[in-house]
Amino acid sequence: MDAKRLTHLQQLEAESIHIIREVAAEFDNPVMMYSIGKDSSVMLHLARKAFYPGKIPFPLLHVDTDWKFKEMIEFRDKTAKKYGFDLLVHKNPEGIEMGISPFVHGSSKHTDIMKTQGLKQALNQHGFDAAFGGARRDEEKSRAKERVYSFRDKNHTWDPKNQRPELWNTYNGQVNKGESIRVFPLSNWTELDIWQYIYLESIDIVPLYLAEKRPVVDRDGMLIMVDDERMELKEGEKIEYKDIRFRTLGCYPLTGAVESKANTLPEIIEEMLVATSSERQGRAIDHDSSGSMEQKKRQGYF
């Protein structure tokens, strides 16, 4: 197909499918991270397209912290059953035994033990040499400078000064024994691109992205949804019901909602057209300290 005749979204789709196929052909044991969010849903859709009518030739991996929204887990299991892909779910057993909680131990320690260490455990356990992730460059400044092929050493750490040039959509996937890469097929997409593609391709998403009246607590300027009985209220806090939706999804105590009436995809797209902030502003883990995300990525986080 003539690239000049492709729409903007078709060009992004073609680029992403090319990257997914390249990795599947070049690496021995790839895996696709499945965080259940909108970007993961788009990436899964692209992987299905890349190998249609065949089955996706690698498993999907969800690192479960035990603190995801209930609707996320329900959606994950329903989606795996619907499409029949190989789904691996990993929880850090040491973290579970320690009873790690974002309420008790804070966002930084919770993220390190349950997400970063849990991810590294799963990658080591299965010997994966390439892991797809749904991160985009427009989300956050450390992700903006990350390559499509993001090289990691034997400890899964990221050195932004030790990455390879990617000229003319050519990727060098050569790694030494014990090294691996993280791959980001959606690097050049924006949040608006994601929503427009979801709408045009009729991709299923977690209902939490759509506005609805839900129980929330206003904590330090963030609207935290009360998702289960483990929600710990601080002195002076009270539960209110507000029309909210989520621009990003993670562990429920660490993910802020936005007040919104947008309960259809066209209404969400309309909101995105006038949005002036990144969706990551609703993630508490990004505000632990200055450069917080880059520090986490250097330690092995996605």
UniProtKB/Swiss-Prot annotation:
<protein>
    <recommendedName>
        <fullName>Sulfate adenylyltransferase subunit 2</fullName>
        <ecNumber>2.7.7.4</ecNumber>
    </recommendedName>
</protein>
<dbReference type="GO" id="GO:0000103">
    <property type="term" value="P:sulfate assimilation"/>
</dbReference>
<feature type="region of interest" description="Disordered">
    <location>
        <begin position="279"/>
        <end position="302"/>
    </location>
</feature>
<comment type="function">
    <text>With CysN forms the ATP sulfurylase (ATPS) that catalyzes the adenylation of sulfate producing adenosine 5'-phosphosulfate (APS) and diphosphate, the first enzymatic step in sulfur assimilation pathway. APS synthesis involves the formation of a high-energy phosphoric-sulfuric acid anhydride bond driven by GTP hydrolysis by CysN coupled to ATP hydrolysis by CysD.</text>
</comment>
<dbReference type="Pfam" id="PF01507">
    <property type="entry name" value="PAPS_reduct"/>
</dbReference>
<comment type="subunit">
    <text>Heterodimer composed of CysD, the smaller subunit, and CysN.</text>
</comment>
<keyword id="KW-0547">Nucleotide-binding</keyword>
<comment type="pathway">
    <text>Sulfur metabolism; hydrogen sulfide biosynthesis; sulfite from sulfate: step 1/3.</text>
</comment>
<dbReference type="InterPro" id="IPR014729">
    <property type="entry name" value="Rossmann-like_a/b/a_fold"/>
</dbReference>
<comment type="similarity">
    <text>Belongs to the PAPS reductase family. CysD subfamily.</text>
</comment>
<dbReference type="InterPro" id="IPR011784">
    <property type="entry name" value="SO4_adenylTrfase_ssu"/>
</dbReference>
<dbReference type="GO" id="GO:0004781">
    <property type="term" value="F:sulfate adenylyltransferase (ATP) activity"/>
</dbReference>
<keyword id="KW-0548">Nucleotidyltransferase</keyword>
<keyword id="KW-0808">Transferase</keyword>
<dbReference type="GO" id="GO:0070814">
    <property type="term" value="P:hydrogen sulfide biosynthetic process"/>
</dbReference>
<feature type="compositionally biased region" description="Basic and acidic residues">
    <location>
        <begin position="280"/>
        <end position="302"/>
    </location>
</feature>
<dbReference type="InterPro" id="IPR050128">
    <property type="entry name" value="Sulfate_adenylyltrnsfr_sub2"/>
</dbReference>
<dbReference type="InterPro" id="IPR002500">
    <property type="entry name" value="PAPS_reduct_dom"/>
</dbReference>
<keyword id="KW-0067">ATP-binding</keyword>
<dbReference type="GO" id="GO:0005524">
    <property type="term" value="F:ATP binding"/>
</dbReference>
